[in-house]
Amino acid sequence: MEITVYIPGIEENQRPHFDEIFSTFAKRGNVREAVSSLHKLFKKQKNTGLLASLVILKQFVDTSRKSQERFNLLEILQQTKFLAQSIYKHIKSQEHSCDMEDMFSDCKDRMSLILSESCGCLNCITTTKQLMNSLCDARPPKLSSHKKVCQAHNFLTTVHNQVVVADRVSVSVLSLSDLVLDMGDFPELPKDIQLETRGVASCVYLCWFYYMLLKHVQNDFEILEASINNWLLTNGYSQGFTSYDNLLPIVTTKRGSGELTYNLDSFQVLQNTLQTVRNFLTTQPPRREQKHLLTLLKEKGYYVEPKESMCKTPQCPEEEGGLPFLKKLGTG
C-alpha cells in the first residue's frame, strides 16, 4: 500500500535539485549530508515540505545497502551483550542487574581500583586515568598495561577506526573470542585477583565493542529523527517526535495547487526502525547461540551454569521478530 505525501515549497525548476539530493544519498549513503542539503533547499524551517522530505529520506535510509549492512550487525550486538552479561554474573557470583550501562560503569570502577591498588605503577596509574576519562564509544585504552601487545585492544582499535574513518565495520561473531581475556594478560597482578581481573577487563572490552557497534548501527536513524524532532518543536508540536504515524496528517495534507508529490511504501514509512532495533536488543540470542557462547566461556576457563547466565529478558524468536523485519526493510 502506498501513501502520497505533498511537498510544498518546491518550484518546478527546483525538481532536478530535489531529486539529486536523494540520488546522491543513494550513491554515498551520507544522511547528514542529505539532511543538510534539504535544509538549504527549503531555507524556511516552517515549510512542511522540509518535514515531508525528511519522511521521504527515511524510506531511502531504511532500504539502503548501508543500512542492510548495519542490520546484519544486530545479531553480533545481541551476542556481545549476552556474553558480557554472562561474564558479569560469573564475576559477581550472584544475580545482578544486566543493564549494559550499569555493568560498564561498575566494571570500569572496579578495573581502575584493581590497577591502582594491586599494582600502582606509573603504567597502571596512567591506564586508570585514561579508563575513567574515556567515553563508551571512544577509542579504549589498553587495560593490560604491562603487555606490549593486547589482541583485544588491537581489535577494538581497528573497529573504532572503521567506525570513525571508513564508516563501515567488518566483524564476525568469531571476533568475540578475542575480547574474552586470559589470566596471562595480567602477569603483574597477584595470582588471587588475576581471575577476577580478566573477567572485569573482558566485560569492559565487550561493553566498549557493544557501544561502538550500537552507535554505528543507530547513527543514521538518530540523525534523521533528531532533525524531524527539531522541525516539530520549532513548529509548535510540543511533544516532538513520538511516531511516524503522527506525521502523516501533516505530510499527506494538500495545501495548494501544483504541489510536488511523492509516493511512499506505507509499511516502511510507518515503522519506527530505530525503536525496532532497540526492541530487538532487549531480547536474548536463540538458544543454540547461547550454548555456543557458553562453550566459548568454558574454553576460556569460566564456569558458567546455563541457568545462571540467563538474564531476565525475553528470548528472540528464531523464525520471526525484530531482525527478520529489519532484513525485510533493507531489501527495498
Curated annotation (Swiss-Prot):
Similarity annotation: Belongs to the herpesviridae BBRF2 family.
Protein name: Uncharacterized protein in IE2 5'region
Species this chain originates from: Bovine herpesvirus 4 (strain DN-599) (BoHV-4)
